[in-house]
């Protein structure tokens, strides 16, 4: 049977969009396929690079990266990139050139910017034009330093923001608050604190914490419009402390996807948090992680979202026990009226020790939603 090359029938505009999803080093390799493909990668509206992918001879790979980008930007001088993703490993001090390059990309109207810095020293990343970008739709930063801007941030198109291992100097959360407050259409927000971030909240009612209290309150108000959020244990603890000491947290009217990580002692925060935000009238997806066996589960509150909107629940890293894991599962099955699927995944260690009777009890739990499926992963 004669083979047919369907890909060659695709127009160039479709091929470049396909190549956009590949690392640039793989996109470049397609240039050997045929004469048509020789320069096609140059028309891809984005780059996905790692500095150590460049050869170390005759230049250090960082210099090779800079030379490559200079030539590429010269070739694309009259067009703008949709996406730029860089994983930067620094050894010879070319970060200033990288920052200049990113500033140029922003000036040219970049839409998606992802920067992952692997350096020994913190890098002051954001330039003024990034704070004022009219085209950025998604921004993801790792291991950089953000300094407090002395002007109003304006990112009118930014919908996705991820900040991981970010350093803020002396101004702390105020920097993030300013950044988020300038994003009127923000939908997805992910904040992951550095491992050595020792910020504590203490008693928020104490006078010495008044500044933190105000910052947290303003910050919660700013992020209350997000649709998708991921929170760690320390964040859930802060929310719980705020609601207990200072009153209800702002309502998250648009929130439809919540992912949270709990310790063995903090699970009790879950219904309180959900109830504190009636706040979740649109919540449909809930993902929970438990690196330890949950204890002292005694849920009496049933948030409105469980009754009216919650459709998918996923519980990860669970260890089933008669009075903990099963009770947690029962809580959702017995109170979620429109639940469509409950997915349970267990730690490898837990799977080896699991009592088969535990699975049977899960499958026979009383379900308020008759169509709910229980998936054991």
Curated annotation (Swiss-Prot):
<dbReference type="Pfam" id="PF00646">
    <property type="entry name" value="F-box"/>
</dbReference>
<dbReference type="InterPro" id="IPR053781">
    <property type="entry name" value="F-box_AtFBL13-like"/>
</dbReference>
<dbReference type="InterPro" id="IPR050232">
    <property type="entry name" value="FBL13/AtMIF1-like"/>
</dbReference>
<dbReference type="Pfam" id="PF08387">
    <property type="entry name" value="FBD"/>
</dbReference>
<dbReference type="InterPro" id="IPR032675">
    <property type="entry name" value="LRR_dom_sf"/>
</dbReference>
<feature type="domain" description="FBD">
    <location>
        <begin position="297"/>
        <end position="346"/>
    </location>
</feature>
<feature type="domain" description="F-box">
    <location>
        <begin position="4"/>
        <end position="50"/>
    </location>
</feature>
<protein>
    <recommendedName>
        <fullName>Putative FBD-associated F-box protein At5g44940</fullName>
    </recommendedName>
</protein>
<dbReference type="InterPro" id="IPR006566">
    <property type="entry name" value="FBD"/>
</dbReference>
<dbReference type="InterPro" id="IPR036047">
    <property type="entry name" value="F-box-like_dom_sf"/>
</dbReference>
<dbReference type="InterPro" id="IPR001810">
    <property type="entry name" value="F-box_dom"/>
</dbReference>
């Amino acid at each position: 049977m004669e083979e047919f090359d369907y890909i060659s029938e695709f127009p160039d505009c479709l091929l470049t969009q396909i190549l956009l999803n590949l690392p640039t080093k793989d996109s470049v390799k397609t240039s050997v396929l045929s004469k048509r493909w020789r320069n096609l990668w140059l028309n891809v509206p984005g780059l996905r690079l790692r500095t150590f992918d460049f050869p170390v001879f005759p230049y250090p790979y960082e210099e090779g990266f800079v030379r490559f980008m200079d030539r590429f930007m010269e070739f694309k001088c009259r067009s703008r990139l949709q996406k730029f993703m860089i994983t930067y490993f620094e050894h010879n001090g070319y970060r200033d050139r990288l920052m200049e390059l990113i500033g140029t990309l922003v000036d040219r109207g970049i839409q998606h910017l992802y920067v992952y810095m692997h350096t020994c020293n913190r890098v002051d990343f954001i330039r003024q034009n990034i704070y004022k970008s009219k085209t950025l739709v998604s921004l993801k930063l790792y291991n950089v330093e953000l300094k407090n801007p002395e002007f109003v941030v304006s990112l009118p198109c930014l919908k996705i923001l991820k900040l991981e291992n970010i350093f803020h100097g002396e101004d702390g959360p105020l920097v993030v608050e300013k950044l988020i407050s300038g994003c009127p259409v923000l939908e997805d927000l992910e904040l992951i604190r550095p491992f050595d971030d020792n910020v504590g909240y203490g008693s928020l009612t104490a006078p010495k914490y008044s500044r933190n209290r105000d910052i947290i309150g303003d910050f919660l108000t700013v992020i209350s419009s997000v649709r998708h959020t991921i929170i760690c244990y320390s964040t859930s603890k802060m929310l719980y402390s705020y609601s207990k000491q200072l009153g209800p947290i702002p309502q998250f009217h648009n929130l439809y996807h919540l992912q949270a990580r709990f310790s063995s002692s903090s699970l009790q925060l879950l219904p309180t948090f959900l109830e504190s935000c009636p706040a979740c009238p649109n919540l449909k997806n809930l993902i929970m992680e438990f690196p330890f066996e949950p204890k002292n589960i005694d849920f009496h509150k049933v948030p409105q979202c469980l009754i009216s909107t919650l459709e998918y629940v996923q519980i990860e890293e669970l260890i089933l026990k008669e009075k903990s894991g099963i009770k947690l599962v029962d809580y959702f099955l017995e109170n979620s009226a429109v639940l469509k699927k409950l997915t349970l995944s267990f730690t490898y260690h837990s799977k080896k020790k699991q009592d088969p009777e535990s699975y049977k009890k899960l499958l026979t739990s009383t379900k308020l939603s008759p169509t709910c499926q229980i998936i054991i992963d």
